[in-house]
């Protein structure tokens, strides 16, 4: 019997992780994140990696584990890693949940004919809401990233620690969230190694700018998505 592949996809900040956790609890299937930035464990907060407590006992894994200095994994390499993982899982799992994420990776999958012959697909696309709803969701997410509960790192902590290594700069400047913080720090002449000391007014400005950046990225993801091929075999209840 072919493995069932649940694909949950949609733009950034639309609730994919919550849906994948709910589906994993209902089916017992493991989740593989299709987010290429989440492969960098040092960017856990800024990339939206869920906390262990948020997984509610479900299984979740990432395509690989990379340092920021190695850069974000290219889409073609991510596609190959994912394909190999799915092949291995198909030997002992009845279903897998693929949660994405990276439109570049999903487009690489769409261009790869091998996916048409692997398993049955149950497709769940999350529709991008209107701007007002999206921005409200993004603001909550960004506030949580900037001001997490006590005992948890913030995106500012991540940036401050990583900035000490010049080899990380170009990568950080190319990732949503970190990019806006770096731009603001430079324009305001705030040293990155003191970024965790910003005041409430600056924090509010960063929330607005990062939320807007997420919205623009979400629109780009929607425009770039190629569409699921008709050759992908659908499961009966897809």
Swiss-Prot record:
Cystine bridges: none
Source domain of life: Bacteria
Keyword Ribonucleoprotein appears in the UniProt entry: no
Coiled coil, from the record: none
Enzyme class label: transferase
Keywords: Cytokinin biosynthesis, Transferase
Catalytic activities: dimethylallyl diphosphate + AMP = N(6)-(dimethylallyl)adenosine 5'-phosphate + diphosphate
Catalytic activity, EC: 2.5.1.27
InterPro entries, alphabetized: P-loop_NTPase, Tzs
Pfam family for this entry, one: IPT
GO molecular function, one term: AMP dimethylallyltransferase activity
Biological process, per Gene Ontology: cytokinin biosynthetic process
Purpose: Transfers dimethylallyl groups to AMP as part of the biosynthesis of cytokinin phytohormones.
Family: Belongs to the isopentenyl transferase family.
Identification of the protein by name: Adenylate dimethylallyltransferase
This protein's encoding gene: tzs
């Amino acid at each position: 019997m072919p493995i069932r592949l649940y694909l949950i996809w949609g733009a950034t900040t639309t609730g994919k992780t919550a849906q994948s956790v709910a589906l994993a609890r209902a089916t017992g299937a493991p989740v593989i994140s299709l987010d290429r930035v989440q492969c960098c464990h040092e960017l856990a907060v800024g990339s939206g990696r869920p906390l262990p407590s948020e997984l509610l006992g479900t299984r979740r894994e990432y395509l690989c584990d990379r340092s920021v200095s190695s850069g974000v994994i290219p889409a073609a390499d991510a596609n190959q890693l994912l394909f190999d993982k799915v092949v291995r899982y198909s030997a002992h799992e009845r279903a897998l949940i693929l949660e994405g994420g990276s439109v570049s990776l999903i487009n690489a999958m769409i261009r790869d004919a091998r996916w048409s012959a692997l398993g049955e697909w149950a497709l769940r696309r999350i529709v991008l809401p209107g701007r007002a709803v999206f921005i409200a969701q993004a603001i909550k997410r960004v506030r949580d990233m900037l001001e997490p509960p006590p005992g948890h790192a913030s995106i500012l902590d991540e940036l401050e620690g990583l900035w000490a290594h010049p080899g990380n700069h170009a990568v950080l400047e190319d990732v949503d969230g970190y990019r806006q913080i770096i731009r603001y720090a430079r324009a305001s002449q705030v040293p990155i190694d003191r970024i965790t000391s910003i005041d409430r007014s600056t924090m509010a400005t960063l929330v607005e700018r990062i939320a807007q950046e997420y919205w623009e990225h979400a629109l780009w993801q929607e425009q770039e998505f190629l569409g699921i091929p008709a050759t992908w075999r659908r499961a009966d209840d897809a």
